[in-house]
Amino acid sequence: MKLSWKTLLLWSLPIFVVGFFFWQGFLGPTTTDVGSNIASSRMTYGRFLEYLDMGWVKRVDLYENNHTAIVEAVGPELGNRVQRIRVELPASAPELITKLRKANVDLDAHPPKSTSAVWGLLGNLLFPLILVGGLAFLFRRSNNASGGPGQAMSFGKSKALFQMEAKTGVVFNDVAGVEEAKEEFQEVVTFLKQPESFTAVGAKIPKGVLLVGPPGTGKTLLAKAIAGEAGVPFFSISGSEFVEMFVGVGASRVRDLFKKAKDNAPCIVFIDEIDAVGRQRGTGVGGGNDEREQTLNQLLTEMDGFEGNTGVIVIAATNRADILDSALLRPGRFDRQVSVDVPDFRGRLAILEVHAKNKKMESKVSLETIARRTPGFSGADLANLLNEAAILTARRRKSAMTMSEIDTSIDRVVAGLEGTPLIDSKSKRLIAYHEVGHAIIGSLLEHHDPVQKVTLIPRGQARGLTWFTPSDDQSLISRSQILARIVGALGGRAAEEIIFGDAEVTTGASNDLQQVTSMARQMVTRFGMSKIGPLSLESQGSDPFLGRGMGGGSEYSDEVATNIDKQVREIVSECYKEAKKIVKDNRVVMDRLVDLLIEKETIEGNEFRHIVKEYTAIPEKNYYISQF
């Protein structure tokens, strides 16, 4: 284990203190050299004077500023041998020197050694200095640590990252797929650069702009681009950084942030994930959070307290606009809400072109094909897709990406890591029939999405996969399309039952059944696509953590609930009958496709449709995916 010098210092401090006391008590220097002359016996000062009067004292050495004497004496009581005796002298004995001189006693005075005084001074000062220094070090360390005692006076300061000249490295040309949002923010940039063009006609720029959209759609990237284009001071902070463990810190940080913003106007204040502090007040199972609500109230006050054209523009981002407080969204605070949604085909193509600039690709790679293959992908998903393809290209020791790496990367991003191929067995043949059942129904139904490929290569939790790619970006879905999807999802289970019998039906269709039940129930309760009629029977706002639907009962009667269940079962039952009929009518082509799938493990959509056409007619669809 490697220890830092700070850790070693902290551990050595108590050891040093113990060693210092041991040295002082046992090995430390004395103030004089009397220790080398200490006699084996002692006597009182009065007895010493008697020896002096009797003439037994021959020599006296004075130590410790005449406080101690070492006496050499000879007498009958001492066995007529020279004895060295220690005598403690009184503080005031002026007659002693006179008596010693009259008795012709050798007298010598020994002054204290200068080195002993130095050691004594150091001994007295060293420990306090070490103690004070150690405490100062610990205090400074805790002062610099996050959340330490020294931070108490700085809790109310804003933690916003400040850049006098926003060096985000991002401009509008680096942001693709959100053209509508870029047009909205172009006005903001123009105001920051040329405010007089707005004020001249009495216009007021919005004080706040709220970016709303799913994760990964580029909200934060768009804010960076605005700062990079405008070239003004840029403050950025996360909503969770306002609130701390101490009461009042959040409101204080809001005040400090807007004070700095006004001092540096014109500028941009970007608050990411504002739902952390802007959530609706007074809601939830346990009531409101007082500290968070104080912070929100201060934020509302600061935003509404701006003067008309101070040049401070607040931009916030969230993917939970439905939980924000209504007072935060009113005009005068966040005047505009800019939706940054998942890009359509053109948006995906533009995003891919941006991220492909620094990627080496073969000339045969079609970004248009990739864009059509990836409906529902966000900008972050597309960036990750090309990065995964680049990593796979390097792993395969290729110099440039091909469609093979991109196809594999799409499968990995959507379905997970590739597993070990299945061995030839009854289980593999059953899975093959299951997947071919999905694919052949999807190919023969007019309103179903076209098959992109069928594979037996496991990915994630799936032992086999059938890929369907929508013909376009579908924002509206018809009843026929939903029913076709239900029939297609039931195709795998129908194939298992028809080919292997009811007793051999497996659990492989569990996820399919979940999707089927969900789609059928939404047809009845949400979309009004059943015999019940055009009614919305879905519970509205049933989120107890936002104070919605607390203790609320059902909005319809038990009879209606029973009818809903009946309609759901009827829809699924009719679709299942149609799925089994298609499987029975196309058993021959299914057997051929299963044998081919077991042999190749993957059949591309074009090849699949070509084989099916040899046996039956296929409805015309928009097939745009080229074969990889």
From Swiss-Prot:
GO cellular component, one term: chloroplast thylakoid membrane
Classification via CDD domains: RecA-like_FtsH (cd19501)
Cofactor note: Binds 1 zinc ion per subunit.
Reported cofactor(s): Zn(2+)
Catalytic-site annotation from UniProt: E435
GO BP: protein catabolic process; proteolysis
Stromal side, ranges: 1-7, 140-628
Membrane topology: Multi-pass membrane protein
Catalytic EC class: hydrolase
One Pfam assignment: AAA_lid_3
Residues annotated as binding Zn(2+): H434, H438, D512
EC number annotated for this UniProt entry: 3.4.24.-
Location(s) in or outside the cell: Plastid, Chloroplast thylakoid membrane
Function, in words: Acts as a processive, ATP-dependent zinc metallopeptidase.
Descriptive protein name: ATP-dependent zinc metalloprotease FtsH
